[in-house]
């Protein structure tokens, strides 16, 4: 009964018609054409056909914290070092505004809708395609690590239905220093590094950070002064970068 009532409450605005605006065919085609790229422009930058793949999902980070993306100077110097040894995509925009929306965008390439989150509709979410399943067909092992509670936003359910081999969250790291939301990032990075050395190859492994989420109770220094309102957030990003 609870699931039925919850579903009705979350979708009641759709009972009165389509809540989305309809664009003309010309507008739609013009938008889609921007994504068309000739195949010969693709460059293969790896030497290994089956490299290990590591995703580090940075909680609440934005271009405002990254100097090369017209952000403030000095907040993320270590990220800047990574830019010099990799590729930085500058024409990239957020797919949503909550963590649960991000998961289905990142792993299932599913767009975010304004009023509903598909991850909370398990019967639909389990039918989504997933990079994890595609890589598994190529012999990949998959894992996901988070220092907080993956029950938030129904993320754990989504990861299970997408058949990740290893899923670990706060309860698996209860011996590590923690704040109100979970294990501090510096300790999770250490654990993650250790776990990577144990995984069967090739693998796809993900770490979702936490310390740059409110209430920003990380154990690092608060030495960056931006403005009173944003100081805690900016310093939390600097902490994760460090």
Which residues fall in each region the model found?
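Soluble catalytic regions of membrane-associated enzymes that act on cell-envelope
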Residues: 1-242
């Amino acid at each position: 009964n609870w699931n039925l009532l919850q579903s009705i409450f979350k979708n009641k605005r759709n009972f009165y018609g389509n809540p989305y605006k309809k664009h003309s065919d010309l507008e739609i085609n013009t938008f889609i054409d921007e994504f068309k790229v000739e195949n010969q422009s693709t460059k293969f930058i790896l030497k290994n056909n089956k490299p290990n793949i590591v995703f580090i999902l940075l909680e609440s980070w934005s271009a405002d914290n990254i100097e090369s993306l017209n952000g403030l100077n000095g907040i993320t110097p270590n990220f800047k070092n990574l830019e010099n040894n990799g590729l930085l995509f500058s024409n990239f925009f957020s797919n949503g505004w909550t963590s649960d929306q991000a998961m289905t965008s990142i792993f299932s390439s599913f767009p975010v809708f304004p009023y509903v989150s598909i991850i909370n509709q398990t019967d639909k979410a389990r039918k989504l395609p997933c990079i994890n399943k595609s890589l598994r067909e190529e012999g990949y092992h998959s894992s996901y690590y988070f220092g907080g509670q993956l029950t938030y936003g129904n993320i754990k359910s989504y990861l299970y239905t997408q058949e990740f081999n290893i899923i670990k969250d706060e309860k698996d790291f209860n011996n590590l220093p923690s704040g109100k939301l979970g294990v501090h990032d510096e300790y999770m990075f250490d654990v993650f590094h250790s776990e990577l050395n144990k995984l069967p190859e090739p693998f796809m492994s993900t770490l979702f950070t936490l310390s740059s989420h409110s209430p920003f109770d990380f154990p690092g220094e608060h030495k960056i002064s931006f403005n009173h309102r944003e100081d805690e957030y900016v310093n939390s990003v600097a902490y994760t970068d460090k």
